[in-house]
Amino acid sequence: MDQKNNNLFQKAIEEVFAVSFSKYAKYIIQDRALPDLRDGLKPVQRRILYGMFQMGLKPTTPYKKSARAVGEIMGKYHPHGDSSIYDAIIRMSQSWKNNWTTVSIHGNNGSVDGDNAAAMRYTETRLSLYGFELLKDIDKKLVSFINNFDDSEKEPTVLPTLLPNLFINGASGIAAGYATNIAPHNTNELLDSLCLRIDQPNCELKQILKIVKGPDFPTGGNVYFEKSLSDIYQAGKGKFIIQAKYEVNKNLNQIEITQIPYETLKANIVKQIEEIIFDNKLSAIESVIDSSDRNGIRIIIKHKDFLPAEKIMAFLFKHTQLQVNFNLNNTVIANRFPIQIGLLSYLDHFLKFCHELIINKAKYELELASKRLEIILGLIKAISIIDKIIKLIRSAVDKSDAREKLIDNFKFTFNQAEAIVSLRLYQLTNTDIFELNQEQNELEKTVISSEQLIASEKARNKLLKKQFEGYKKQFHQQRRSQICGFINQKKVEESELIENKTYGVLITKAGNYHKFESNQLLKSTTDFKSESDTIIFAQTIANTDQIFIVTSLGNIINIPVYKLAFNSKNKLASLVSKKPILLEYETIVFVGTMNSVNQPILVLTSKLGMVKRIDLTKLNIKPLKATLCISLRDKDHLVSAFLQQDDKLICLVSDHNYYTVFHTNEIPLISSKGMGVKGMKLKLEDQIKFVVAFEANEPLVMICSDGSVINLKQTELVVVSRMATAKKLPVKKAINYCFSDATNTQLINFQGKNGSKLITTSELNQMSKTAISQTRFNKLN
């Protein structure tokens, strides 16, 4: 219960909140966010147009500073901040947002790229011809006026327009519990549909839709729909799909985009295509160039000829704003309440409003004409007895006495007598009776036509059709958007987007890569220079193939070759990039190709001597997603991985030159989450440095830190069981590299300060110790 004390009210917060919010919600629904069905304007837009009209900013008058208009509108009609008013003015002036702009701006009013308009102190504004037409005859009492926010001015509740502006320019807005999104339509089609509705008040929607083809957006584009047009326009709700319009130049392998979807930013579309090129999501696209100018939009996409332009565009429609959805929702204010309105209902409501305007105008003109006709008839009568009138006026004591005598003696009405005595005698005697008779005839015609318009719906319909035909000529509009019917989205398989070509791919331990022409494999490998990184994979491979990498953190990652960006220059890209495949501290241990599925067993070895085998076919490996293939303890990481064909010997070599050799089949097959088993007993502070898989007849080649090369035959090595006591190698120096080679022809990468060189084992044996000691080596797969 309310308690009143010293003009204070105590109420429960939930009661205050409910009442206050409901009032606020009603206000923003009725007076802020939703357009009026009749003139298609929100309150701020209506106040802007009326404020400019009151300032005399007509299409034929000079521009005035936007800041001045904003101040006038804010001070008299819309006290909600200058930025909201100026933003609305700018939007009302943008030809890519409206079929017909209601405001004209002199200066920078933004761009289709989303650039901001110049500040209001720099731009100038006035009403456009279309905007002025919305206000036509507003001073003839066609619409009602209400007090402004401080009761110091009057403002119209609606503009007296005979143009169906709601559907011509569309509208969008969000209120409490309501939202609206009305599509722009073609002016000529709407006016023709109104004429049809006048001629055939009971016509069906399908007849209207033969005229109104669908939305017509200022930026054009191809328009599709999922439900039928009749369902969408019957309910006033539905979804349109807008696609960019493009042309194909097959000779130049170019796609030229000439129209973009409504409410999208050209710069964002270009950026999205550039990101697709940068991320190598579609290798068929070579470049995108924005060549747009004042003559229109022109985005040029250069592409390779292996993929048709239609499939490229199908991909871009899916992954960029070259295709967007427009969710139609015709929510408007009608009779102070929000309703969702279909096309037929809108035409009927609007025609009813037009009839009200015509009747109000006819009443206004009838009143003026009747009053003037009364005066003219009195003047004509006075001229016919001018001598008596003059004599009577001269005998009168004053003006009121003369007026009374005219009424009493000659039966003039009060208004007629007032008009006569208000004239000077020379005006009365010199008045041309012919001109008065002519004006009488015109006024009588006006009275008759006004009375006819008030009384006859048929007469009003005739006038409306004439007005609509005039608007069709004055605001003639060619259709910009093409209505293409039901959407039939072309499905493009990923395999179709991949260029069937062989490339060279080079991958380093640190996660850098280079994709190049296949004939440049040797050059790219030998040109590689790095003091801290090492090549571990250099191979020609089909673009349609896939590689997988095993990392030091125990992850296995599948990478489609086409996802690797091509670079004609000898420049490395990184897998630790904007969208990282590897973590910054993660390195690559092994690289294989997915065509090795016939060798699905992967053998893994960690720094702390843990070994395991894993079946690749049982892993759910997804492209570009890390899949765990071994669990690692703290401070442990993978040092080796290789694919097992048959049972081989595996040699684990430690930092302290201990080794153990056993058969790979002794290593158990373990699930991806398993840590594996001990492969070698390590002494304190020792760790695995090299892992070599080899056949029984293959020698081990060891490169020592002093540059010496040692070949150990299998007979010199002790083959034991896994976890047997490690043996000491007959080598005193630290081992820099270790590999197997039975033929002395194994290619290894000789990497020095001045670049890289591919050499065989036999060539290695002929090098000096000094040269060998200053280089790094690695076997290439």
Curated annotation (Swiss-Prot):
Pfam family, one: DNA_gyraseA_C
Top-level division of the source organism's lineage: Bacteria
Gene3D superfamilies noted in UniProt: 3.30.1360.40, DNA gyrase/topoisomerase IV, subunit A, C-terminal, Topoisomerase II, domain 5, Topoisomerase, domain 3
Domain (Topo IIA-type catalytic) ranges: 34-497
Site (Transition state stabilizer): 121
Record has Iron as a keyword: no
GO molecular function: ATP binding; DNA binding; DNA negative supercoiling activity
Membrane topology: Peripheral membrane protein
Cysteines joined through disulfide linkages: none
SMART domains: TOP4c (SM00434)
EC number: 5.6.2.2
Annotated GO biological process: DNA topological change
CDD domains hit by this protein: TOP4c (cd00187)
Annotated active site: 122
Keywords: Cell membrane, DNA-binding, Isomerase, Membrane, Topoisomerase
Keyword S-adenosyl-L-methionine recorded: no
GO CC annotation, single: cytoplasm
Main location: membrane
EC class: isomerase
Subcellular location: Cell membrane
Function: Topoisomerase IV is essential for chromosome segregation. It relaxes supercoiled DNA. Performs the decatenation events required during the replication of a circular DNA molecule.
Family named by the database record: Belongs to the type II topoisomerase GyrA/ParC subunit family. ParC type 2 subfamily.
Subunit structure and binding partners: Heterotetramer composed of ParC and ParE.
NCBIfam families the UniProt entry points to: parC_Gpos (TIGR01061), PRK05561.1 (NF004044)
HAMAP family in the record: ParC_type2
Name of the protein in question: DNA topoisomerase 4 subunit A
Organism in which the protein naturally occurs: Mycoplasma genitalium (strain ATCC 33530 / DSM 19775 / NCTC 10195 / G37) (Mycoplasmoides genitalium)
